[in-house]
Amino acid sequence: MKKLVVLGGGESGVGTAILGKQKGFRVFVSDKGNIVEKYKKVLLNNEIEFEENQHTENTILDADLVMKSPGIPEKVAIIQLLKNKSIPVISEIEFAAYYTDATIIGITGSNGKTTTTLLVHHILKKANLSIGVAGNIGDSFAQQVAEKSYENYVLELSSFQLDGIDKFNSNIAILTNITPDHLDRYDYDFNTYV
């Protein structure tokens, strides 16, 4: 059985853990901070092993695959250790996309993502399409793939969520705009952000 380590015990992490367990992975969730009580309950109810307030390196470096929550920068030590060991580190969006054949509309940009995502979702729902909304809003994409069977998804995708994308491609992509936001995460280089 392959081991999936999930770094981050929030919305993206817990959703990925649920989907990973459903797909036959041995799942371990690690969060450097506290895991919110509602997420702890979900992990306990699904019998998913977890730790909080630390990252146990030996346990994490034993992974076959790692999902990094969007709030964790690429530069942190544990991510660098994983990359040095050639352990794949992907995003929740990438992981969830492996397990759905749904049509995906991806919406990104510096401003207007949420409004555009909700508008597109509303229009398509009114057109009676089987449509879920996820990404940076609502339930995680991974959790929805695990628990629901939508034929289409509208995903709000922040730049942080797009870090760790390898093969993910939405069927339709919308870029609202690009302005110099979050440059601290991208070494203050606008081209890296873009």
Predicted regions and their residues:
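N-terminal leader/targeting and accessory segments in enzymes
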Residues: 1-91, 95
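Phosphate-binding loop of NTP-binding sites
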Residues: 21-22, 58-61, 70-194
